[in-house]
Amino acid sequence: MKVAIFGGTFNPIHIGHLIMAQYVKNFSEVDRVIFVPNGVPPHKNVDIALPEDRFEMVKLSIEDNPDFEISDFEIKNKEPSWTINTLNYFATSYEKVYFILGSDNLFEIIKWYRAEEILKKFPIIVLPRERNTTLIRRQIEELGIQFSAKMVLIDMPIIDISSTEIRRLIRENKSIRYMVHPKVEEYIIRKGLYKE
């Protein structure tokens, strides 16, 4: 089975994440998209909900889609969530492992822990975060030349929703309806998440 690993803080998961994952399933050769919420994100120290809450929100968002699944690999691991460790873990169980990367991280990936190994070993599905893809395509080409990286850019609409904006709306007691799965909205309200 060919799988695409969709890692992230998912703080909280929103419809943009779900649409991106569905585009990956629709327009690549992967059989399944595996959501992997970060346990201890190495590069972020913002207002992050408990790993268990973020895991539950992802689970609620994807439970009715047979093409999606969730893994607690990073959440169970108490070490920082390094991408290479996660990809290597899944590579032991699946025929082919792809890595989903937002184009905003395309220019940062070479600074990541064991970046060269990621780029040489795993094919990468790039999702655009901006309308003009000229620089993105150029960077994909350069990484291909420098590291023999296998990358493909999925042509899809820009989904301009962010978890940061959702958390701000919650703090201001504004509605997040249509921005997250209804079950996630219900969960956030019930648990009182992101109020402070």
UniProtKB/Swiss-Prot annotation:
Reaction equation(s) it catalyzes: nicotinate beta-D-ribonucleotide + ATP + H(+) = deamido-NAD(+) + diphosphate
Any one biological process term the GO annotation gives: NAD biosynthetic process
UniProt-listed Enzyme Commission number(s): 2.7.7.18
Keyword set, alphabetical order: ATP-binding, NAD, Nucleotide-binding, Nucleotidyltransferase, Pyridine nucleotide biosynthesis, Transferase
SUPFAM superfamilies linked to this entry: Nucleotidylyl transferase
InterPro entries: Cyt_trans-like, NadD/NMNAT, Rossmann-like_a/b/a_fold
GO molecular function: ATP binding; nicotinate-nucleotide adenylyltransferase activity
Pfam families the UniProt entry points to: CTP_transf_like
Domain of life: Bacteria
Pathway: Cofactor biosynthesis; NAD(+) biosynthesis; deamido-NAD(+) from nicotinate D-ribonucleotide: step 1/1
Known role: Catalyzes the reversible adenylation of nicotinate mononucleotide (NaMN) to nicotinic acid adenine dinucleotide (NaAD).
Family designation: Belongs to the NadD family.
Cited HAMAP family: NaMN_adenylyltr (MF_00244)
PANTHER family: NICOTINATE-NUCLEOTIDE ADENYLYLTRANSFERASE-RELATED (PTHR39321), PHOSPHOPANTETHEINE ADENYLYLTRANSFERASE (PTHR39321:SF3)
Name of the featured protein: Probable nicotinate-nucleotide adenylyltransferase
Species for this entry: Caldicellulosiruptor saccharolyticus (strain ATCC 43494 / DSM 8903 / Tp8T 6331)
Upper lineage: Bacteria, Bacillati, Bacillota, Bacillota incertae sedis, Caldicellulosiruptorales
Name of the gene encoding the protein in the UniProt record: nadD
